[in-house]
Amino acid sequence: MDTTMVNLWTLFEQLVRRMEIINEGNESIEFIQVVKDFEDFRKKYQRTNQELEKFKDLLLKAETGRSALDVKLKHARNQVDVEIKRRQRAEAECAKLEQQIQLIRDILMCDTSGSIQLSEEQKSALAFLNRGQASSGHAGNNRLSTIDESGSILSDISFDKTDESLDWDSSLVKNFKMKKREKRRSNSRQFIDGPPGPVKKTCSIGSTVDQANESIVAKTTVTVPSDGGPIEAVSTIETLPSWTRSRGKSGPLQPVNSDSALNSRPLEPRTDTDNLGTPQNTGGMRLHDFVSKTVIKPESCVPCGKRIKFGKLSLKCRDCRLVSHPECRDRCPLPCIPPLVGTPVKIGEGMLADFVSQASPMIPAIVVSCVNEIEQRGLTEAGLYRISGCDRTVKELKEKFLKVKTVPLLSKVDDIHVICSLLKDFLRNLKEPLLTFWLSKAFMEAAEITDEDNSTAAMYQAVSELPQANRDTLAFLMIHLQRVSQSPDTKMDIANLAKVFGPTIVAHTVPNPDPVTMFQDIKRQLKVVERLLSLPLEYWNQFMMVDQENIDSQRGNGNSTPRTPDVKVSLLGPVTTPEFQLVKTPLSSSLSQRLYNLSKSTPRFGNKSKSATNLGQQGKFFPAPYLK
């Protein structure tokens, strides 16, 4: 009974308290606040739905625009395909007609015995044919006047021999070989020296003599003036070296007997204005071997950093793969450093030789790129090499250089100190310092010699004992640091540069030095760098000199790749197919003779001009990118 009363009393008290709360009116305020919160959430949800609808409309418009662009791209690809096929059919038909005209000329003009008597009508018809040939050749010259150096703009922009240009069936163009491209380029240069004069025709009436390295060919040239003047005939016998199918490698035509010659005209010497290009004043550095290319996938110009748009003409180096605008050609960084054949060891843990190619000068591409960019933008920057750049950016750039095949554009890096730190980091993290463990003691001892002449001689001896990669890289770096020290804006004299690069490029005398030895070596390292920077510039420049003639011969020989020997045939072989038309024509032989005479003159800086050499190196093309 008592328990029941207690429970009832407790329940009664709870009811009383709740009644008091209701009477006070607090519950209504809380309910109103909840309703307001729900209203705020409802408004936010409404705004979110409106924004969602807006973005859905924008997405729909973007999808529509993308679909329209896809259709345009598809039509453009189809149109390119159609135009390529149409041009190839026209070229095949043109080649067939040229072959027929060639045979007619051979019959009418190669008769030296005079058995064929030409009437006035026949002379008029023959002069008409000659005018047609001259006009067509001149038109071709105008068409290719801007690409005489490489002759690649009229090559198939969608296809090449690598079958990697576009994503359609490459079997459509496999029947049109590279020889036709070479023929078109050869024809485009027939009148490069000026307007055509009286047309001459040369035909072979002799046979090839099977000897060791040459063949003897007899030829007759008949000149028929278009104004009905007297007909001139010239007969010559020439000895020709076996043709290597490379106009850049074919030797000059040497006449061995000209007793039957009725008339002869010496070749006019070419003036400086006839040069196809002017080489840079490089002091013997390795030059770039440029070829022209029509851009399909947009690329960036290395000298100026701007994008090269679709369909524009660009230049690409065969060796280092550098890309530039034609007008930026003279601003490309030198020397030309070919890319590595394989992938080096872990980043920053390799020897210097792991990061260089086998071509001289043996300098890592990262060093060349950094130095060229620093000299372009950093010679007016105070504290160059003393101020550190962002470590994260330096690490990212280093990975791009050593992992990616293409060289990143350092012109897009705003902070020049990042590039300086990149160069120092690369040299610092090599397995073996630039001056090597083996020779570090010799360099230190040479720097401590009090007599300047003896110290310089000992330094020369130590430099000569370095591996070629270390020696070339050291020379390139010293040339650069001397330029930095000569710039007053950088405020980095030889002493300051020695403080930066002493511990970087000079090794310690022992593998694991203690603190005392490290402190002693630092002073000696500074003396070594100061002594190296005091050596004359001419001494370092000699390591940058390369024999451009040997480089060109290596390029032409495909880096000494073994191949099947060429068959000894006459350059004026039988006229049977359009491909053999490019073997020997009167105008092409005249041009090759003139190019040979031009190359025999004394070149600038002791090396042959690359502009004349490049004309004979058009049989190979680099892989074009995919068009997706």
Curated annotation (Swiss-Prot):
Start-end of Polar residues biased regions: 274-283
Residue runs in coiled coils: 33-110
Region ranges (Disordered): 179-201, 242-284
Sites of Phosphothreonine modification: 162, 343, 564, 577, 585, 602
Region: Interaction with SLC26A8, residue numbers: 107-286
PROSITE patterns, sorted: RHOGAP, ZF_DAG_PE_1, ZF_DAG_PE_2
Site entry: Arginine finger: 386
One GO location term (cellular component): cleavage furrow
Any GO BP: sulfate transmembrane transport
Tissue distribution: Highly expressed in testis, thymus and spleen and weakly expressed in brain, heart, skeletal muscle and kidney. In testis, expression is restricted to germ cells with the highest levels of expression found in spermatocytes. Not detected in adult liver. Also expressed in fetal liver and in several hematopoietic cell lines.
Chain ranges of the Rho-GAP domain: 350-540
Cross-link Glycyl lysine isopeptide (Lys-Gly) (interchain with G-Cter in SUMO2), where in sequence: 249, 405
Zinc finger residue ranges, Phorbol-ester/DAG-type: 287-336
Residue positions where N-acetylmethionine is found in the record: 1
GO molecular function, one term: protein-macromolecule adaptor activity
SMART domains the UniProt entry points to: C1, RhoGAP
Function: Component of the centralspindlin complex that serves as a microtubule-dependent and Rho-mediated signaling required for the myosin contractile ring formation during the cell cycle cytokinesis. Required for proper attachment of the midbody to the cell membrane during cytokinesis. Sequentially binds to ECT2 and RAB11FIP3 which regulates cleavage furrow ingression and abscission during cytokinesis. Plays key roles in controlling cell growth and differentiation of hematopoietic cells through mechanisms other than regulating Rac GTPase activity. Has a critical role in erythropoiesis.
Subunit comment: Heterotetramer of two molecules each of RACGAP1 and KIF23. Found in the centralspindlin complex. Associates with alpha-, beta- and gamma-tubulin and microtubules. Interacts via its Rho-GAP domain with RND2. Associates with AURKB during M phase. Interacts via its Rho-GAP domain and basic region with PRC1. The interaction with PRC1 inhibits its GAP activity towards CDC42 in vitro, which may be required for maintaining normal spindle morphology. Interacts with SLC26A8 via its N-terminus.
Domain comment in the entry: The coiled coil region is indispensible for localization to the midbody during cytokinesis. The phorbol-ester/DAG-type zinc finger domain mediates interaction with membranes enriched in phosphatidylinositol 3,4,5-trisphosphate and is required during mitotic cytokinesis for normal attachment of the midbody to the cell membrane.
Protein name: Rac GTPase-activating protein 1
Organism: Mus musculus
